[in-house]
């Protein structure tokens, strides 16, 4: 037997049979069911892949692949048109705009400073509108408080007038008589206009009784169409010669500060004698005879 010029692997059949024998000797070979080793007859006129159902499926698969190829071709053409035709043209257009922007001045467009000023003005307008709204609300509140205060003042004035009328009706009018001269009618004035809503004195207490007659303070009277004006006071009478049964005569001219303003501030004879008095010698002798103070 002539040797083959091609190299062959030695003992290849022996290795295959040994590997098959090792698989058969394993546990998996004993567990798995054995093949029945049934061989169906092969009909060359009726192959499995040439069945009508399989043929239709392969035809539909071929049509789908052709359609996919057409779609991919169209997508590739679109991509090339965008990358080559549109992107380059659009990029050149944007580049031209940027170059024109840097090289050409547009007088109608605001500059950066003008744009910042416009933004600042818009903020000021918003602030002004907000402040105007606050001022309007405060004015309404002020008007409401004024109306409320006016109503409170009217109510308090009516209450004080009613109180003063009831007080005048309840308390009879009296006059202070000094000496035996003509008397002066004392009229308690209406102090309605002197009172207000925030006054802490509404009903002043009556003064305590005293033997010394006090000067009467009459508040200015508010004249209305229903209140007649008081009569003028009578001229003061000379009551220096009459004595009062209630106390001292208070209608005398001032004597306490008379020497400060006229020429009566002169030393009198008794004061001069008092100042020129000679010390008593007996008193001096008694003072010298005393022991020293310890």
Swiss-Prot record:
It is found in: Nucleus; Cytoplasm, Cytoskeleton, Spindle; Chromosome, Centromere, Kinetochore. The keyword DNA repair does not apply. It comes from the Eukaryota. GO terms for biological process: attachment of spindle microtubules to kinetochore; cell division; mitotic sister chromatid biorientation; protein transport along microtubule to mitotic spindle pole body. Residues 121-163 form a coiled coil. The keyword Cell division applies. Residues 160-171 have a biased composition (Basic and acidic residues). Residues 227-237 have a biased composition (Pro residues). GO terms for cellular component: cytoplasm; DASH complex; mitotic spindle polar microtubule; mitotic spindle pole body. Residues 1-47, 140-294 are annotated as: Disordered. Keywords: Cell cycle, Cell division, Centromere, Chromosome, Chromosome partition, Coiled coil, Cytoplasm, Cytoskeleton, Kinetochore, Microtubule, Mitosis, Nucleus. Residues 1-11, 262-273 have a biased composition (Polar residues). Residues 13-23 have a biased composition (Basic residues). InterPro entries: DASH_Dam1. Component of the DASH complex consisting of ASK1, DAD1, DAD2, DAD3, DAD4, DAM1, DUO1, HSK3, SPC19 and SPC34, with a stoichiometry of one copy of each subunit per complex. Multiple DASH complexes oligomerize to form a ring that encircles spindle microtubules and organizes the rod-like NDC80 complexes of the outer kinetochore. DASH complex oligomerization strengthens microtubule attachments. Within the complex, DAM1 and DUO1 may form the microtubule connections. On cytoplasmic microtubules, DASH complexes appear to form patches instead of rings. Component of the DASH complex that connects microtubules with kinetochores and couples microtubule depolymerisation to chromosome movement; it is involved in retrieving kinetochores to the spindle poles before their re-orientation on the spindle in early mitosis and allows microtubule depolymerization to pull chromosomes apart and resist detachment during anaphase. Belongs to the DASH complex DAM1 family. This is DASH complex subunit DAM1.
């Amino acid at each position: 037997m002539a040797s083959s010029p091609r190299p062959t692997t030695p003992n290849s059949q022996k290795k295959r049979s040994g590997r098959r024998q090792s698989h058969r000797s394993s546990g998996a070979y004993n567990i798995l069911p054995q093949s029945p080793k049934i061989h169906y007859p092969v009909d060359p006129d009726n192959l499995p892949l040439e069945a009508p159902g399989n043929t239709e499926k392969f035809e539909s698969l071929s049509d789908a692949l052709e359609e996919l190829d057409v779609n991919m071709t169209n997508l590739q053409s679109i991509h090339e048109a965008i990358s080559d035709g549109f992107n380059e043209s659009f990029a050149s257009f944007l580049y031209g705009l940027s170059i024109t922007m840097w090289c050409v001045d547009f007088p109608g467009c605001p500059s950066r400073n003008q744009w910042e000023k416009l933004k600042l003005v818009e903020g000021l307008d918003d602030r002004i509108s907000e402040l105007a709204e606050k001022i309007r609300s405060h004015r309404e509140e002020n008007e409401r408080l004024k109306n409320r205060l006016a109503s409170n003042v009217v109510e308090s004035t009516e209450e004080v007038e009613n109180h003063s009328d009831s007080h005048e009706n309840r308390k009879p009018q009296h006059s202070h008589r000094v000496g035996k001269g003509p008397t002066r009618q004392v009229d308690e004035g209406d102090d309605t206009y002197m009172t207000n809503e925030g006054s802490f004195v509404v009903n002043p207490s009556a003064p305590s009784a005293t033997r010394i007659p006090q000067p009467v303070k009459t508040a200015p009277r508010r004249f209305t169409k229903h209140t007649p004006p008081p009569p003028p006071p009578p001229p003061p009478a000379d009551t220096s010669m009459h004595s009062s049964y209630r106390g001292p005569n208070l209608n005398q001219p001032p004597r306490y500060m008379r020497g400060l303003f006229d020429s009566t501030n002169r030393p009198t004879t008794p004061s001069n004698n008092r100042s020129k008095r000679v010390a008593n010698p007996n008193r001096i002798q008694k003072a010298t005879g005393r022991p020293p103070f310890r």
